[in-house]
């Protein structure tokens, strides 16, 4: 579970402001999560997440004080870009990034909740499908959706996935699930706060990639 627990997300303060530097430090290690799915077919999602992290980091590093929190980035870019906002800058990058992060969150939550295909209990195809349907499907065109259906054929066995999360170490499933639940606490709170922020600022867009 080293892929997740070595870089846990920090608890949010009462006002739910998300420190940009801390967020970027934690999220920058998540692209490796897709290597645990065992197929290069998932690489487009990994590449998308990596690219959006780079865009957000570039904006943050241009003025760390002005963009101390993710909320400050959206507010600053709203003023900067005017009518082009929110389809611009780090605001657009974070919009897509949060969807990729949501995919990870739903997938891990589904596994930790014990959801499975009774006919193939050691496959995580049902968990990946749920995560994709909730987090990404509505924002993908027909071609991308078909590509994802192909990717499902390469979905790993749960045992192999959990072992990959633990960087090849043999660990009991119960221990892995408990560590996933621990990781999800602050991670889920952070993702939810970003979604709420986008809704409050009317920054959410529903166009398809």
UniProtKB/Swiss-Prot annotation:
2 X 12 AA approximate tandem repeats, as annotated region: 45-66
Binding site for beta-D-galactosyl-(1->4)-beta-D-glucosyl-(1<->1)-N-[(9Z)-octadecenoyl]-sphing-4-enine: 48-55, 140, 207
Chain positions of Sequence repeats: 45-55, 56-66
One example of a Gene Ontology biological process annotation: intermembrane lipid transfer
Cysteine disulfide partners in this protein: none
PANTHER family hit by this protein: GLYCOLIPID TRANSFER PROTEIN, GLYCOLIPID TRANSFER PROTEIN-RELATED
Family: Belongs to the GLTP family.
Record's protein name: Glycolipid transfer protein B
Source organism (scientific name): Xenopus laevis (African clawed frog)
């Amino acid at each position: 579970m080293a892929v997740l627990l070595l870089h846990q997300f920090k608890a949010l303060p009462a006002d739910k402001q998300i420190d940009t530097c801390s967020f970027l430090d934690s999220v920058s290690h998540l692209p490796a999560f897709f290597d645990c799915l065992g197929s290069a077919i998932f690489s487009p999602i990994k590449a998308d997440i990596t690219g959006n992290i780079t865009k957000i980091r570039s904006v943050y590093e241009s003025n760390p004080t002005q963009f101390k929190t993710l909320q400050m980035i959206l507010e600053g870019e709203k003023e900067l870009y005017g009518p082009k906002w929110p389809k611009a800058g780090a605001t657009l990058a974070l919009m897509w990034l949060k969807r990729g992060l949501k995919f990870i969150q739903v997938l891990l939550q589904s596994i930790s909740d014990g959801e499975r295909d009774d006919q193939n209990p050691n496959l995580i195809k049902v968990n990946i499908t749920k995560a994709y349907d909730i987090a990404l499907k509505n924002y993908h065109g027909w071609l991308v959706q078909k590509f994802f259906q192909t990717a499902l054929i390469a979905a790993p066995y749960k045992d192999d996935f959990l072992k990959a999360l633990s960087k090849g170490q043999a660990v009991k499933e119960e221990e892995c699930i408990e560590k996933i639940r621990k990781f999800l606490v602050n991670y889920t709170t952070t993702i939810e706060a970003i979604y709420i922020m986008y809704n409050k600022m009317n920054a959410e867009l529903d166009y398809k990639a």
